[in-house]
Amino acid sequence: MDTATQPVIVLGSGPVGLGVALLLAQSGRAVTVYEAKDELALSDANSYPIGVNPRGQETLRRIDSALLDRLREHGEIVRGWRIFAGGRLVAKLASGTVWSTTRAFVNKILLEKAEADPHLTLVTGHKLARVDVAARRLVFTLSSGEETTVDAAGARVIAADGVWSATRRSLIGQVPGFDPEVGPWGVRFRVLFSKPGAKAPGLDPSLHYIFGDKGMYSATLASEVWCVAVTAIEGTEDEPLLLATEATDANVAALQEFVRQAAPLTAPLLTREDYVDFFGRDSFTGAVIRCPFVNVGEWLVLIGDAAHGVIPPTGEGVNSGLEDALLLTEHLNSGSATPFSDYNAARMPDLAALGEYAWFLMENVRSTDPARRTANVVWRIAGVLGKPLGLKAGQVEERLFGPAADRTPYRAILAPWIRQKDRVFPVLHALARAGFGLARKLRRRPPATREPA
């Protein structure tokens, strides 16, 4: 079958699945997208903030430049970041290349585009149960609970079914050598949303703020709606409150106090009603995924979180997935007889580098070790300051989100960081452990007593 006209099955209708479906439909291919949910309820209120950097923007532009116009109407340009530790401003990062929005909004504008595309069919209520690699069949569970099987032998299958990908799980044991690493985040993120036009002394809506002590993050959307994201780390004393689902007076008061202590600059943004609404919102978790390869011959390929789940502090979740969609489409349209293998060979060095970066950040985010968390703050400050400290390899954030950010391959950006991290971070961690150990000894030492005169 001609690879340029071969039908395509896409699993998953998130931003990555719809992105690749729309790109492939441009060439007249018949594309069918299978989605587990009966209906996609896409609202900012039950989503989370993301920044769309030049990687994600380029994919949206290639699909339709009007999508970028929608993004700019709804979002806010991020002029930069401010990083706080212990209530003190410790680092600044300039940007001007990233647009602030929510994952739900990006998904929404892509879905609206997909629903109007005559070459694209969206099939809802089909949750992938398993993949039969030998028979080239896909087995779905319908909303009714019944199973149905789709013969996909004559199609190319693109699995964009997310971090908990049923496709990826199915390949284990069926595909020799396929043994992905799955590292659960160990945290859940949940978001407070302000009323439109909210303001607070010391906060600039063109800036995003990171409060390192408790892993809090604030960002703005259109109409100066502020998002204040909190991090519930498994096993910590804050976790029950941050995951509570009842807006009791006690919970609301405790959450208000938590925000005042952890991110005091954001407290004036939020009303009591904003705190009440928080307890009715979803929380989000995930995992860092590292696969040894992402294709099964020329029949199936994994992209997005199914292939390389990251963690929000990377800023690359949706962006890297949208870039997958664009690069995979270029290989499929190249005329090569082996586009999936070509994509795998070209993309894996970048995914390996991104995976190592994400794994490191995951271990820091979920750590309850104060020494590691202190070392991480120091390492992150060094990464932002970079040049003045002679740590050019630490400037990952600047190259991903700074004023000159572009689509430089991840391997080129992250290789120097990986080399330096392997040398420097263990030293920082050891020094922090020693410092905390000394502090504990001093606290235990009995006070000196004086002999009576």
Model-derived regions, located:
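Conserved N-terminal helical subregion
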Residues: 2-8, 25, 53-191, 406-413, ...
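Glycine-rich FAD pyrophosphate-binding loop
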Residues: 25-45
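Conserved FAD-binding catalytic core of PHBH/FMO-like flavoproteins
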Residues: 112, 117, 126-130, 135-283, ...
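C-terminal helical "tail/cap" subdomain of flavin- and related membrane-associated enzymes
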Residues: 4-5, 268-269, 330-453
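Conserved mid-domain beta->alpha element of the FAD-binding
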Residues: 10-26, 37, 158-159, 192, ...
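Conserved N-terminal glycine-rich FAD pyrophosphate-binding loop of Rossmann-like flavoproteins
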Residues: 38-59
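Acidic/histidine metal-binding catalytic segments
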Residues: 70-74, 121, 260-279, 336-344, ...
